[in-house]
Regions:
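Sec-dependent N-terminal signal peptides
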Residues: 4-13
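Glycine-enriched alpha-helix->loop->beta-strand junction motifs that scaffold or abut catalytic
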Residues: 105-108, 135-139, 194-201
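Boundary at the C-terminal end of the N-terminal hydrophobic targeting segment
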Residues: 13-20
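Solvent-exposed loop/turn segments at secondary-structure junctions
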Residues: 29-33, 69-70, 89-93, 116-120, ...
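Active-site beta->alpha N-cap acidic-glycine motif
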Residues: 21-26, 31-135, 166
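C-terminal domain-boundary segment and adjacent tail
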Residues: 43-77, 168, 194-214, 219-225, ...
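Alpha-helical scaffold elements lining the catalytic groove of polysaccharide deacetylases
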Residues: 95, 124-138, 144-174, 184-195, ...
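Hydrophobic faces of well-ordered beta-strands that scaffold small-molecule active sites
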Residues: 23-25, 63, 85-87, 109-111, ...
Length: 242
């Protein structure tokens, strides 16, 4: 009887099957010139522009976490070829370089901020975070100092309560979405994230949890040396149509 009730609850809570996913892209630092070598966590502004141009020219539409959550729960239809664009780790270049490129193609993104870096050299300031939010982008939480939440002995007030409050004060808006540092999660972390009022959480490439799909949404790290064409093929490979 308990198993039947659980199945009914899952059907009501998640109208989409766990295996049906929307592409979610994950970026980190952005640079100009020859200051860095492109890699899994670094991409040049020119290459980012090329990738976004390929998405736009091939009919992709950026969506927000609110739209994704409503779709998962069966409350909303998504536009053709939806994609979510996310940036981790609070780099100042998210504002100075990524935001203008996003605007060029009419895209919106999610910026997952670790609050220990706010205002430090090379990282987003409070004013920049507010400006991104005011432009229609979503500000999400990425803990206080990027501590992996599956490691045990976590100070949840420091890693969840305070960062959420800080970001909500800066933006004047609810902070409803979370990204796990290093993509690492366990059920204890999920329970804490839910208890702190987050509506969904994003990991990296590990398998989604069948019990908690909304709190283990997969993302693909986009390599800095991928061409636009390569990005399109990787999207189809990682998030195949169902």
């Amino acid at each position: 009887m308990k198993r039947v009730l659980l199945l009914i609850f899952c059907v009501m809570a998640y109208a989409r099957p766990v295996c049906q996913e929307v592409p979610v892209l994950c970026y980190h630092n952005i640079f100009t010139g020859n200051s860095y070598t492109p890699g899994p966590l670094r991409i040049s502004a020119d290459q980012l522009d090329q990738q976004f141009r390929s998405l736009a020219e091939n009919g992709y539409h950026s969506i927000s976490p609110d739209e994704l959550l409503a779709w998962i729960q069966g409350r909303k239809q998504l536009p053709p070829k939806p994609v979510m664009i996310t940036f981790d780790d609070s780099h100042a270049t998210h504002y100075t370089l990524a935001a203008p490129i996003l605007a060029r193609y009419g895209f919106k993104a999610v910026f997952f901020v670790m609050t220990v870096t706010i205002g430090k050299q090379g990282y987003l300031s409070s004013a920049q975070i507010k400006a991104l939010s005011d432009k229609g982008h979503v500000i999400g939480c990425h803990t206080w100092d990027h501590q992996p939440l599956a490691s045990g002995n976590i100070n949840w007030q420091q890693q969840l309560t305070k960062p959420k409050a800080v970001l909500e004060k800066i933006t004047g808006r609810p902070v409803n979405y979370f990204a796990y540092p290093y993509g690492e999660w366990n059920m204890a972390a999920i329970e804490e994230i839910k208890a702190h009022g987050f509506l969904a959480a994003f990991q990296l490439s590990n398998a989604q949890s069948s019990q908690e799909p909304i709190f283990t949404i997969r993302r693909m790290i986009v390599a800095g040396n991928w061409s636009g064409t390569r990005l399109l093929s990787k999207i189809e490979e990682t998030f195949p149509p169902k």
